[in-house]
A protein has these predicted regions:
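Hydrophobic/basic alpha-helical segments
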Residues: 1-397
Length: 397
């Protein structure tokens, strides 16, 4: 999921910051990425690199080749034209095929000592900067981007340097000690460093406060809550709750595991909006207890929702081993002597020095998991775990 994808990137940034490093990240933008994929290269790549053969390969060929498209304007329609390149956008296969097509770029990135994260055409390159080697590390990043640009050109993709973004992450103290960077060179362009970037619907600032993201979520929730208030008299309680969950609560829950340990101010803003939403759904006045309204709707408060999401992700990672990267961050606690805690299904909490780094998944996950009662932690059934974990957090309200 997009949330897991961002969790991985931010975990690396947080842990690097704990060792006194800043991280520079470049978010790449492609021009018409899905429309320029070469069919012959794609088919060869899925066959040679991913083992797609036989009937599956023939099906994929029929899906890609001899596809036609027309343009309608009013009552007029153009003649059908064959699509020599590209994969259909908005399809389930589109992002998967794009990822298969660009899979070789991970080796290019690793050859220069940089990290690469890719979710369909959302591609990010980043590298941790140490004071002693900053110049050589920035040069390695630019060399990597130059090599990637050559690869993109050879494979029919066009990198848009003007729309690509760069940002430098780190603690406020660390960023203040760094020299000013002129920018990152890419595709004959120089990208100036931004204070924040938006990726996959998440606005991320250089200090990872998520203030701008929370402000955007609050603004969106306020707009939709007000719209719901106008039509509330025409809805039943059940209909109002369904609309609220689909249009408003979903915005509160999106990537909320990343907001754990955000500022008290941000948490209060989100909680205030959830309280307003609950009053709108149940048609109650402001003097009603918001806690009781949330219980009546069976909605967990904001902080509990964050813990609940982290618990679900951790349970899934421990029981399935996937995604492998997150699984590698979690270690079962093994006491040096035979103690009762040896069979408590506990996780080892890493020793991170800074509060900034303690927002990393590798720290937040085990601390949240270890606080869950043993009888819930040891459940293997996903549905039973979800139900009992939610009941547990409700008992704490």
């Amino acid at each position: 999921s997009t949330e897991i994808w961002v969790l991985r990137t931010l975990n690396t940034i947080y842990v690097s910051a704990d060792t006194g490093k800043a991280t520079v990240l470049v978010s790449l933008d492609f021009s018409a990425a899905f429309d320029t994929i070469d069919h012959s290269i794609l088919l060869k790549r899925v066959q040679m690199m991913f083992g797609v053969t036989g009937t599956a390969l023939k099906w994929l060929q029929s899906y890609l080749l001899n596809r036609q498209q027309s343009v309608r304007s009013g009552h007029a329609m153009s003649s059908p034209t064959s699509c020599a390149t590209g994969v259909p956008q908005g399809s389930v296969l589109g992002p998967i095929l794009f990822s298969c097509y660009t899979s070789p770029i991970s080796k290019i990135a690793s050859a220069f000592g940089t990290d690469l994260q890719q979710y369909a055409d959302d591609t990010q390159i980043y590298i941790a900067l140490s004071s002693a080697d900053m110049t050589s590390q920035l040069q390695a990043l630019e060399n990597c981007l130059a090599s990637l640009n050559v690869w993109f050109s050879q494979n029919g993709l066009s990198l848009n340097g003007d729309k690509s973004e760069a940002i430098l992450f780190g603690t406020q103290q660390r960023l203040r000690t760094l020299p000013n960077l002129d920018g990152i060179r890419i595709a004959d362009s120089s990208i100036c460093l931004s204070d924040s970037i938006t990726t996959l619907g998440l606005t991320v600032d250089r200090n990872l406060t998520f203030n701008r993201h929370v402000a955007n979520v609050v603004k969106s929730m306020h707009y939709h809550t007000r719209a719901l208030r106008y039509i509330r008299p025409a809805l039943t309680d059940e209909m109002a709750q369904s609309v609220a969950v689909a249009l408003v609560q979903s915005r509160l829950d999106y990537a909320n595991s990343l907001l754990f340990n955000t500022s008290v101010s941000n948490t209060r803003k989100l909680q205030s909006m959830q309280n307003q939403l609950a009053r709108t759904v149940l048609w109650r006045s402001v003097d009603q207890s918001s806690t009781q309204l949330l219980k009546q709707l069976h909605w967990l408060p904001v902080i509990c929702r964050m813990k609940y999401k982290i618990g679900l992700i951790t349970h899934n990672v421990l029981n399935t081993g996937q995604p492998a990267y997150l699984r590698s961050l979690l270690t079962h606690y093994q006491p040096t002597r035979t103690l009762r805690s040896a069979d408590q299904h506990l996780l080892t909490v890493p020793n991170l020095k800074t509060e900034f780094a303690r927002r990393a998944f590798s720290f937040v996950s085990p601390t949240t998991w270890n606080d869950i009662p043993l009888e819930i932690r040891q459940l293997s059934s996903v549905n039973t775990f979800k139900s009992q974990l939610k009941t547990h957090y409700f008992s704490l309200i």
